[in-house]
Amino acid sequence: MSRKPCCVGEGLKKGAWTAEEDKKLISYIHEHGEGGWRDIPQKAGLKRCGKSCRLRWANYLKPDIKRGEFSYEEEQIIIMLHASRGNKWSVIARHLPKRTDNEIKNYWNTHLKKLLIDKGIDPVTHKPLAYDSNPDEQSQSGSISPKSLPPSSSKNVPEITSSDETPKYDASLSSKKRCFKRSSSTSKLLNKVAARASSMGTILGASIEGTLISSTPLSSCLNDDFSETSQFQMEEFDPFYQSSEHIIDHMKEDISINNSEYDFSQFLEQFSNNEGEEADNTGGGYNQDLLMSDVSSTSVDEDEMMQNITGWSNYLLDHSDFNYDTSQDYDDKNFI
């Protein structure tokens, strides 16, 4: 069921109230009191709607209404309540005694809204205008890609930093420096090993030519260029450095140029005797009257002797003393 309208629209006056209409309404309410707004227009002799009479009395003609300018405290209360409640003027009017909701609404629209805009505050959200008015600009500025930056600025842009505000690429640079140092020290070590190999080649060549002095030990040649730095590098990069050093010590003790057992001339004589025996079995091919003792060490062809160095190395590897030393070092290594 719909509510019955308070009055019929025919013949009703609209618009501003006159002073005569205000006197009739005030005199009737003083005699009969408030209430019954539907019947008041007929009883008071007014051609107005009952709602219009009620609002005129509540907002203007009521004697306890406070009129005049709003104080600074009242303005602050209205602003704070509007930020939390919005446009609920009747609720705001309850916190301002003797102020009507209609008067508060009119004062907000005519004064307070303009005051907030002048201070740079949005009257709807009560936040700074710069915070809400430029969200698109902030999103565009925050979404600038690194490709749009100039090359000079992109070089100066630091990478992602860690929790202690230090760039992460510092750790990668330090690791690269360590790897470069290790590789450089490794190359130095390999160069020294190559130098040792060349010195061993010169020693064997000198033994073939017979120019090697018998008083020069092999251990002195091995220890000439090994400094403390090379030993430290060997310990750092070779996990079996101690075992290899043990093998070298045994080689120093067991292998000597002065030892007649490892004399290269005897090896050549034995090699020639073996070839002579093979020639006897096969029916010749070599001159049996030729003896190695008749050939001096200085008359031996150097090119042919260098080809037989492989045989000399095989002789060392097949020798019983050398095999015993290497096997003992292998057992010591496994024991460790």
Curated annotation (Swiss-Prot):
- Assigned GO CC terms: nucleus
The consequence of inactivating this gene is: Low levels of aliphatic glucosinolates.
Tell me which Gene3D superfamilies the record gives.
Answer: Homeodomain-like
Q: Where is the composition biased (Polar residues)?
A: 155-164
Under InterPro entries, the record lists:
Homeodomain-like_sf (IPR009057), Myb_dom (IPR017930), Myb_TF_plants (IPR015495), SANT/Myb (IPR001005)
Domain HTH myb-type per the UniProt entry, residue ranges:
9-65, 66-116
Q: Which CDD domains match?
A: SANT
Instruction: Please identify the protein, giving its name as recorded.
Output: Transcription factor MYB29
* Natural source organism: Arabidopsis thaliana
